[in-house]
Amino acid sequence: MMIAANIISLTVLFAVPLLLVALGGMFSEHSGVINIALEGMMIIGALFACFTLQAFDKSGFGPAHPQLAMLAAILVAGLTGTIFSFFLGFAAINLKADQTIGGTALNQFAPAFAVVMTWAIQGQGLTTIAIPSWVRITRDTFGLAPVDGPSFWNNLIFKYFYLTTPVAVVLFIAAYIVMYKTRFGLRLRACGEHPQAADSVGITVYTMRYAGVLISGFLGGIGGLAYTVAAGSGFNSDVGGYGFLALAVMIFGNWKPFPILASSVFFALFKVIAAYSSSLSFLPKFEGVKEISNFYQMLPYIVTMIVLIFTSKNSQAPKAEGIPYDKGSR
C-alpha cells in the first residue's frame, strides 16, 4: 500500500511540470508561434527561482515563512521565464526568423548561461543549487499532529506535496477559462488559425502572438521550478529533457487543456514506474539480463516515441503555426 501511495503522489508531482509547460506551449502555438524553446524557459525559470530560494534560506525568511518564500520563488520563475521568452517572440515575430532554429538556439544558450551564473554566484566548480527542505508542505504547515509509523494517507498527501501542485491546479483552470471562455482566447486562436482574417476584423496579430509567447514563458518558467522540486536533487543547469517531453504531451493532447492534463498524467506515470521498477512485482525482471533498470529508465521516452508515431497523424495543429505573419501579404 505504501508503494501505491508513493506512485500516486509521485505521478502527480511529475505530472505538474509537464502540465504547466505543455499548457505554455499550447498558448504559444495557438497564437501561431512554434515554441521549441520550452526547455530553455524551464531552465531559466528554475535557475532564478532556486537562487531566490537560496537567498531566502540564508536570510532566515524562508525557514520562518516557507510557503511565502516558495510563492515568491514561483513568481520569480514565471517572471524570468517570461523575460526569456521575449527573445523568441522578437526573433519569430519582429524578425520573422525561423521559429525552430530560434527556439533551438535559446535551448542551447540556457544551460550554458545557467552554468556560468551558478559558478559566478556559488564559485567555480559548484554546479548544483540545493533546494531547501522547508519548501515541502507538511502536516505541520496545517497545524496537524505528526503521524506515528507509516500511513497510506499521509504518504499519499504529504510525502511529496509542494506549493507548485495547487498553483498548477489554479493555472490549469485559468488556462482553460482564458483559452475557451474569453474574448482574448478567441482572438488568440484566430491568430493561430487565420491571421489574415483576424487582422481584417481589427485584431492585432503581432500583439496576440507576443501574448501567447510570453504566457508560454511564464508557465514554462514555473514548470522549470516544479521539475527541479520534483527531481529532489537540486538544480543542475538542466531539466532532464522535460521541455521536449512537454512538447510531446502537448501534441498528444492535441493542443487542448483536458487532453494535455490526461497526457501529462500518462507520461508521468511511466516515469514513476521506471523509478520504482525494482519494487514492482508485476514488472518482468528478465533474469540474466544485466542492468535491466536502465531499460525501465528509458521506458518513458520509448513510450513517448511510440505514442507520437500512432497519434501524430490525427493531431490537428493550428493551421498558421510556424508561419511568420506579414501584414502586407493579405
Q: How should these model regions be labeled?
A:
Residues 61-111, 271:
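Alpha-helical transmembrane segments within multi-pass membrane transporters and channels
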Residues 27-48, 93-106, 187, 232-245, ...:
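Short, non-helical or kinked segments that cap or interrupt transmembrane helices
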Residues 193-207, 277-330:
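Cytosolic-side transmembrane-helix boundaries in multi-pass membrane proteins
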Residues 110-180, 282-295, 315, 322-330:
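Transmembrane helix-bundle core of multi-pass membrane transporters
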Residues 156-234, 257, 262:
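Helix-loop-helix "hairpin" substructures at the membrane interface of multi-pass membrane proteins
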Residues 15-24, 40-44, 83-86, 192, ...:
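Hydrophobic alpha-helical segments embedded in the membrane of multi-pass proteins
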Residues 230-301:
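Transmembrane alpha-helical segments in multi-pass inner-membrane proteins
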Residues 1-22, 34, 48, 57-72:
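Membrane-interfacial amphipathic/re-entrant helices at transmembrane-helix boundaries
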